[in-house]
């Protein structure tokens, strides 16, 4: 995200400050939270998840036959090795692995569901991020500041598919 000096911390005392804000409660977000709370147990953090569940891709995609295309000994967590029967695991098993890991590590208590990031602006004078999120369940705007912002949001747009831009797209009829 571009650096700016035009977004100082809002003066409102009600703005929560976190040491770290993690975006996304999927495989990467849960893994990042584990490493953060292990290496920096003093750090305050939250995970903002736009959806209503832990698991990211593995929660969203539940079609028949969905599975990993990487072996779980590589894809899984080094701190909680995969013990499932299948090395190339099905989506439901991977989702359970992520959910169980979050619960066992106490990470689930840090997740704020229905929080979709709208903007993030770095303030050089304040040396912190100001992050604005929208509650997808209530429409409420939430503003927090943080020293570190970790994007673990994956690469899928859950709200719409990818639409490429190509010449004469408006004339394409199918």
Where do the PLM segments sit?
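A short, basic/flexible loop-to-alpha-helix module at the beginning of a structural domain
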Residues: 1-17
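Glycine-rich dinucleotide-binding loop and its adjacent helix/turn
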Residues: 2-5, 76-85, 90, 94-97, ...
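N-terminal Rossmann-like FAD-binding beta1-loop-alpha1 element of flavoenzymes
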Residues: 15-47
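Active-site acidic short loop of glycosyltransferases
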Residues: 15-18, 145-147, 174
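Short amphipathic alpha-helical segments
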Residues: 33-35, 59-60, 161-165
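A generic structural signal for alpha->beta connector loops
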Residues: 42-44, 108, 173-174
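Feature captures the FAD/FMN-dependent oxidoreductase FAD-binding
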Residues: 85-158
